[in-house]
Curated annotation (Swiss-Prot):
InterPro entries: Cyt_trans-like (IPR004821), NadD/NMNAT (IPR005248), Rossmann-like_a/b/a_fold (IPR014729)
UniProt similarity note: Belongs to the NadD family.
Organism in which the protein naturally occurs: Marinomonas sp. (strain MWYL1)
EC number per UniProt: 2.7.7.18
GO biological processes: NAD biosynthetic process
GO MF annotation: an example: ATP binding
Coiled-coil intervals, chain numbering: none
Function: Catalyzes the reversible adenylation of nicotinate mononucleotide (NaMN) to nicotinic acid adenine dinucleotide (NaAD).
HAMAP family hit by this protein: NaMN_adenylyltr
Pathway assigned in UniProt: Cofactor biosynthesis; NAD(+) biosynthesis; deamido-NAD(+) from nicotinate D-ribonucleotide: step 1/1
Protein name, as recorded: Probable nicotinate-nucleotide adenylyltransferase
Keywords per UniProt: ATP-binding, NAD, Nucleotide-binding, Nucleotidyltransferase, Pyridine nucleotide biosynthesis, Transferase
Record field: catalytic activity: nicotinate beta-D-ribonucleotide + ATP + H(+) = deamido-NAD(+) + diphosphate
Top-tier EC class: transferase
């Protein structure tokens, strides 16, 4: 996957964003498009998990979460929804997904996993978390003006893998960490679920086709 940026320079890289997407909302989508616009990666895959390892069971069926994600990205052909974790069923481990993707894109393609800061801070609790860097880079979306205290494991991890510039994520297939501040949107899936439960408006928090899908299927009631 190789394209040219606005200056004619070839840029490659496949970015991925995992999550429960219960439901997908404008915060997820804004993160995705800002990353694509800012770094000019070839594409970004949204990968809904079947069963999150560190959270409770999602509120709606896996197929419904997948369908909402597809509706949400239908107007941007740089985005796609990947069903591999849904197809696998059972707990969704990122390391398994990254191994699959690496085998598909080959050993030389840059693979970038996008994480929110909360997910990054919980990284040492993930299954085989230290092997992630063998397969991908991490692009961590940080909060404006917030410098979290890193536990010793993560502090050492950042010392070993932190990139000097985001360009390093495009020059190697894996093994670097970059922190990037994006536009903060105070939207969460739990907020939307609570509004829907109380039969209050969820307009403008998520794409209109997703809003209509939720209302049509009476989800989160």
């Amino acid at each position: 996957m190789t394209i040219r940026d606005n200056h004619g320079v070839k840029v490659s890289g496949l970015a991925i964003m995992g999550g429960t997407f219960d439901p997908i909302h404008n915060g997820h989508l804004r993160t995705a498009v800002e990353i694509l616009d800012r770094f000019h990666y070839s594409a970004l895959k949204l990968i809904p998990c079947f069963q999150p390892v560190h959270k409770g069971r999602p509120s709606v069926l896996p197929q419904q979460r997948f369908e909402m994600a597809e509706l949400a990205i239908s107007s941007d052909d740089r985005l796609c929804v990947d069903s591999r974790e849904m197809d696998r069923e059972g707990p969704s481990y990122s390391i398994d997904t990254l191994r699959d993707l690496r085998s598909e894109v080959g050993p030389d393609e840059s693979l970038i996993m996008v994480l929110g800061m909360d997910s990054f801070l919980s990284l040492p609790t993930w299954y085989k978390w230290q092997e992630i860097m063998d397969y991908a880079h991490l692009l961590v979306v940080s909060r404006p003006g917030w410098e979290p205290d890193l536990i010793s494991e993560l502090s050492g991890f950042c010392e070993n893998y932190r990139a000097a510039s985001p360009h390093e994520l495009q020059c190697a297939p894996s093994g670097r960490v970059w922190f990037e501040t994006l536009t903060p949107l105070g939207i969460s899936s739990s907020m939307i679920r609570e509004l829907a439960r109380k039969k209050e408006s969820i307009a403008y928090l998520l794409p209109e086709p997703v809003q209509k899908y939720i209302e049509q299927h009476q989800l989160y009631r």
